[in-house]
Amino acid sequence: MTSRSDLLSAVADMLSTADSIALCGHVMPDGDSLGSMLALGLALRSMGKQVHLLSPDPVPDQYLGLLPGADDIKSELQVPDIPEIFVSVDCSVPDRLGHFKTLLNRFGGIIIIDHHAGGVNFGHLYLNDAQAPAAGEIVFELLQLLPVDINVDIALCLYVAINTDTGSFRYDGVRPATHRIIARLMETGIPVSQINKQLYEEKPVVCLKVLGEVLKTLDVSPCGKLASMYIERNTLNRLNARDEHVDGVTNYPRTIKGVELALFFREMDDKRFKISFRSKHFVDVNKLASQFGGGGHQRASGCIVEGKLVDIRRQIVDAALIALEEEGK
């Protein structure tokens, strides 16, 4: 088995020898996917590489005004020649690359950089560390092996990546190395207070309207350990809300005293729901989500299920209650 350090070196070597590189994040891009991709892209461009930044879905507004280079991210690969290397950032499931999945067989080399459990090795180099709380940590380590300086722009992107995927450093996966990396990033002079205000205190009013509608659906189980909420597409349409305006809602039920497991059901389109799972202490929600074709981390995961909301909720709530009983012993 190839060691982690050898994998990092192999990835650095492949990137160093390539002239043109495509970097792609996952559908419904978040701060870790975008921040990690942009940090790596800025670093590679400083090495003289031709870099194409790709996202299957639009970049949320809150990141466009915050992350350097975010306005350069494209939804299509608009070049006559396919780049030599394709790097999947924060994603090790081909379907989560959206329409870019269909281009994978056209690249000479494919690198996967991820930290989600249950991924698939669909590339030539598979750098997946499920112990890392964010892909941004892995990218930071990778940059130590490349001839680049971590400047303010790169540091800002990595700070956003790690900050957002660790719940502002509140989640279980945060480790001493996380804070050491953050210290290194802060030493470049990034405006940490300003970044956090823009991430968490500059939301459009529609976000609060969405939250208000979602909170009306809050349901806590008789045992007090399971809480769930949902939002349907017709409600989002009535509020003129986009999917990005729902981000962060998932964690609200978990803040209730005594609740171990939180579920959030979001209608994506007709009869397709994204279910987000969050746990506090002991329920392995990666295992729970895998029962429905999904996955993620022990304390945060998700899946997509097709059907009627009432049936999906009943099925998943039943499975969640079983998990609470079995894993709480």
Question: Where are the regions a protein language model picked out?
Answer:
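Short glycine/serine/threonine-rich phosphate/pyrophosphate-binding segments
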Residues: 31-37, 94-98
